[in-house]
Amino acid sequence: MIADKDGTILCVLAGRWRYAISQAQIEHFGLIDPVDAPIDQRGHPLICRHLATLLGDAEVLAPGRHHAMTVVLRRRSVALLVNHIDNLDGTGPYEIHPLSPLITRRLTLPWFLGAIIYQDAPLLLLDLHRIATDVAIGAV
């Protein structure tokens, strides 16, 4: 399967690890300080969570403004905070490789769409909509 028709796969640094994301799942990119109690475009409080913490990385971002990816759900919006967001250097579109059943069965949460090969190494492709949904319903 090809990632997006226009190849909009980005790389995020969340804690110590890099992941691939689909730009199509993001409503807005920006800088957010969660202490400021940000609101979404509908005037509701924006739910802010550190993506690295959700993915099991113990490294915590320092207080202050962080790169944020806002995912809009039906009733709420979730801002996933990361260390850095960047374009992938190279040619797209990228082919999404499914995760093997062995790996998929061992995942605690089904937050990965597959993997792409970038600079001869795999990058896990995150399902940001699924992550945001789990955050919004309080599952994590």
Q: Locations of the language-model features?
A:
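An acidic, low-aromatic, low-complexity terminal/linker signal
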Residues: M1-V140
